[in-house]
Swiss-Prot record:
InterPro entries: DnaJ_domain, J_dom_sf, Papo_T_antigen, Papo_T_antigensf. The lineage of its organism: Viruses, Monodnaviria, Shotokuvirae, Cossaviricota, Papovaviricetes. A zinc finger (C4-type) spans 111-124. It comes from B-lymphotropic polyomavirus. It comes from the Viruses. This is Small t antigen.
Amino acid sequence: MDQTLSKEERNELMDLLQITRAAWGNLSMMKKAYKNVSKLYHPDKGGDSAKMQRLNELFQRVQVTLMEIRSQCGSSSSQVAWFFWDENFRTLGAFLGEKFNEKIIGLYPTCTKFVRANCNCIVCLLKKQHAGTKKNLKKPCLVWGECWCYKCYLVWFGFPEDFTSFRYWTLLMANMDLSMLKLWTELGF
């Protein structure tokens, strides 16, 4: 996601969204904040039209760039969908329902540290996707959003590899749109 906006623009967007700058990259939180502040800034509701215009410009650039980045990643036959940015996108958590906690990781911490070839937990699937992306693009994953695996999350946000960081990552994954993860084929679709 670092490729989407300059540092100054990222800070400006997060300020316009009225959420902490540390939340940059938390797409679910950013999307929810966008919906809330759009009502606040909308000129028809007495808001600031200049802020609304700038918010739309920056947020649209994030959307377009992220879609382009994700369309080049992974091995699933699914495409990144524009409907992620719509209101009723289907999240991984909603899709897996009560099985989310058992499907997110097969064996903690083993799956976070090693690729388990026969494991189909989300951690291992995303780790395999990460390896495929690196192989296909002949470069490492450089930004959060190009890859959603746990290791890239740790590197991108600078978090330690511990259970607390893992739980925060699982919360992001629970609220992540299935099409953004590009795991349709791997999940049996």
